[in-house]
Amino acid sequence: MVASRNPQTARFCWQYLQLEQSLDFPDGELLRDEAVQETIYQQLFAPNAPTPLPPARYRLRVLKELTSRIESAIEDWETHGISDNLMDAMAELVAQPLPSEAEAAQERCYVTYYLSLLEGGLEKPHITLLESRSLISASGTTGLRTWEAALHLGQFLSVNSGLVKDKRVLELGTGTGYLAVLCAKYLGTSHVIASDGSEEVVEKLSDNLFVNGLQDSDKVQPMELKWGHALLGTEEEHWNGGRKIDVVLGADITYDVSVIPALIATLEELVDLYPGISIIIAATERNRETYETFLAACGRRGFSVTPESFPVPSRAEQKGPFYKDGTPIHICQLRR
């Protein structure tokens, strides 16, 4: 894991591992330091680096800018230089055939998220996921990458872990499984159902459970669940084997007005099955009309919506995970 006592270097490393397009490089005085260069190489570019390496195309782009910045920072070449390890790593990447940008966007790659709010002792809490960084996959699903609302809801739960600790959780629209892994690995939930309406997304969840050491855990259960479809079939007496659900989580599941009626129908059925259940939704306000449509639909079906005071931190304030700060993300508790 990222091991650097310098905040600038650590921040750069965590941003890189999250495959951020805009990186906060350490200042020149640090970059020209031999020890800092070696730390960056060992943490990010060495074949035996402690986290899975990002795609070759991304590594090469960052290495080019990094070495250029180091070169610009050097005032005395008798005293400082560019690490041979960094130059060798770049030369190897230059010699490799690389996929096109379009091809690279569809490939699944490792993305590591640093959980700064859970920092403690020598442990560097993090979640590594296999993701497709394109906005929409070739199959049409949006669930193969982690969206900002999941990261923001994860931060909210990290400082309010009592909401899920020792609880049985159902996540709607789990996507890459970020929240499910967070709850099961770090927040002390007793069980998480990681549900999604896409069969492809549910099938790929096993990869991300494996990467995070949860492949043999009975704390996470992937499930295909389509909103608006009856939870109880004609041959079932109890849904989910009659096991209770305490909390429902959903991040970025109100993205389109067309899905809202089916979502509300599923929430109604869950409330009927589990009276008193807690429902926590994180909604990204890309379009004010869509968000207001969701609020109106909740009101018509008897749900009260209580917004939480948990604004998106500015980019400068973020220490990991990193996400856009220009669009509001509303965290709401629903009750009926």
From Swiss-Prot:
> Where is the protein situated, by its record's location annotation?
Cytoplasm
Q: What is its EC number?
A: 2.1.1.-
The opening ranks of the lineage are: Eukaryota, Fungi, Dikarya, Ascomycota, Pezizomycotina
InterPro entries recorded:
Methyltransf_16 (IPR019410), SAM-dependent_MTases_sf (IPR029063)
Keyword field contains Methyltransferase: yes
| Sites where the protein binds S-adenosyl-L-methionine | W147, G173, T174, G175, D196, L232, A251
An example GO BP is:
methylation
Species, as recorded? Chaetomium thermophilum (strain DSM 1495 / CBS 144.50 / IMI 039719)
Which protein is depicted? Protein-lysine N-methyltransferase EFM3
Function recorded in the entry: S-adenosyl-L-methionine-dependent protein-lysine N-methyltransferase that methylates elongation factor 2.
Keywords on record: Cytoplasm, Methyltransferase, S-adenosyl-L-methionine, Transferase
Which GO CC terms are listed, alphabetically?
cytoplasm
